[in-house]
Amino acid sequence: MINVEIIKNYDKWREHKQINKSLIQKITQNILLRFNNFSKIKQFELSMLLTNTAEILTLNKQFRNIEKATNVLAFPSNELNWQDLYSKLEFLGDSDYMHLGDVAFCYEVIYNESCEQQKTFENHFIHLLIHSILHLIGFDHQNDTEAHIMENLEIEILSYFGISSPY
């Protein structure tokens, strides 16, 4: 079970009814099921903030010390490494619960990027959702090798949902 808490504090998000708890749960479940090590966990939790440029600017300044609006910010609750997902996850212990983390999405940046890249807003959001969930479970793109691995996994998951590669 994946419990998703969504806070929509920017009205433009309400125009996209298909971006809802059910979609987020379905995508998150698709990602987690790819890693057998998560199978013993019965309940996952994820918090989402669907917000605007002003709040993303504040979050970026506060947590990343940058003065720029970004499309998404992911705050993992656990220090996971993607390489450990393919081996034994002893650090999870006997817990059957995991809070994955918090994610904040910026409407205006996503909207502008989707227009520039000639994608639907929803498809671009789904890509960023996949990208952010992968960050929450330990994937990163600090070097070319990591970026390639993460991008290939994103492409595979997007394909499952009928969305073409953004790369």
Swiss-Prot record:
Q: Would the keyword Metal-binding turn up in this protein's UniProt record?
A: yes
- Supply the EC number(s): 3.1.-.-
* GO terms under biological process: rRNA processing
Q: What is the native source organism of this protein?
A: Rickettsia akari (strain Hartford)
Q: Which InterPro entries match?
A: MetalPrtase_cat_dom_sf_prd, YbeY, YbeY_CS
Outline what the protein does.
Single strand-specific metallo-endoribonuclease involved in late-stage 70S ribosome quality control and in maturation of the 3' terminus of the 16S rRNA.
Tell me the domain of life: Bacteria
CC cofactor: Zn(2+)
The family database entries (SUPFAM superfamilies) matched by this protein are listed as: Metalloproteases ('zincins'), catalytic domain (SSF55486)
- Annotated HAMAP family: Endoribonucl_YbeY
| Coiled-coil positions | none
Zinc recorded as keyword: yes
> Per its UniProt record, what NCBIfam families does this chain match?
rRNA maturation RNase YbeY
For this chain's record, the cofactor binding note is: Binds 1 zinc ion.
* Protein name, per record: Endoribonuclease YbeY
